[in-house]
């Protein structure tokens, strides 16, 4: 049973009483990247978001849709910045990613990567258990390109350090892809055209929509 179904179950079972609910559930956040962005800034943002807390936040980036004109370049930029991330502990210097919460969670990440590759995605880097940290719940952050929406990594909440990227042609197509999920927690848009921002803001179906950045609130951590 997925976390969304758990929430629905609680609501059904509590329907006979007068209770107020505030659910902390999962997400499958889409990211739309338009061609007028600063590629270095967006790549750095993606890598920081997906390696901070080892990607274990419910509002994290899950499906990254990149306009096809900049898709190859952004994939390269993300790979470049991902190579600078080291595995380690919070007190280590530099850009460091720690472990996942446990080995079960880590093994699920490896399964998602393996499923994506078998389904046609390309693993650019990562997605392995490092020898130096074999005893912990560490994995190298994974960059997957040419992902499709039918893969598990697109359909399920990732909650870990996997970066799945795929191209799109038009903004209408990207918005349709973004909304193709049972989740609706967070969505993200990177672009500077005012009309496109307005279109994305009106069209994306989520509890919160971030424009040219990411963040969190006490209601949606």
Residue ranges with predicted function:
Residues 67, 161, 193:
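Short, conserved phosphate/pyrophosphate- and ester-handling motifs at nucleotide-, phospho-/glycolipid
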Residues 95, 136-139, 156-162, 181-185:
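Conserved glycine-rich beta-strand-loop-beta hairpin in the small C-terminal domain of fold type I
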Residues 150-155:
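Cytochrome P450 core scaffold surrounding the K-helix E-X-X-R motif
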Residues 1-2, 161:
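Flexible low-complexity scaffold tracts in large eukaryotic assembly proteins
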Residues 164-166:
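Active-site donor-binding acidic/aromatic loop of nucleotide-activated sugar
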Residues 50-52, 117-118, 122, 127, ...:
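C-terminal segments
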Residues 4-148, 171-172, 177, 211, ...:
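ALDH superfamily catalytic-core signature
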């Amino acid at each position: 049973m997925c976390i969304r179904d758990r929430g629905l179950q609680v609501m059904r079972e509590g329907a006979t009483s007068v209770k107020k609910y505030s659910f902390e559930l999962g997400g499958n956040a889409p990211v739309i990247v338009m061609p007028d962005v600063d590629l270095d800034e967006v790549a750095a943002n993606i890598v920081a978001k997906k390696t901070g807390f080892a990607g274990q936040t419910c509002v994290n980036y899950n499906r990254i849709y990149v306009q096809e004109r900049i898709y190859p370049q952004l994939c390269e930029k993300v790979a470049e910045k991902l190579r600078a991330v080291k595995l380690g502990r919070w007190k280590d210097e530099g850009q460091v990613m720690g472990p996942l919460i446990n080995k079960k969670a880590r093994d699920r990440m490896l399964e998602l990567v393996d499923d994506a590759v078998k389904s046609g995605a390309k693993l650019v880097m990562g997605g392995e258990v490092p020898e130096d940290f074999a005893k912990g719940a560490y994995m190298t952050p994974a960059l997957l390109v040419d992902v499709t929406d039918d893969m598990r990594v697109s359909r399920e909440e990732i909650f870990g350090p996997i970066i799945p990227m795929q191209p799109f042609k038009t903004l209408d197509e990207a918005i349709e892809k973004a909304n193709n999920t049972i989740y609706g927690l967070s969505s993200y848009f990177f672009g500077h055209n005012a009309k496109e921002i307005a279109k994305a803001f009106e069209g994306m179906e989520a509890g919160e929509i971030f424009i040219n950045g990411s963040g969190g609130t006490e209601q949606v951590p």
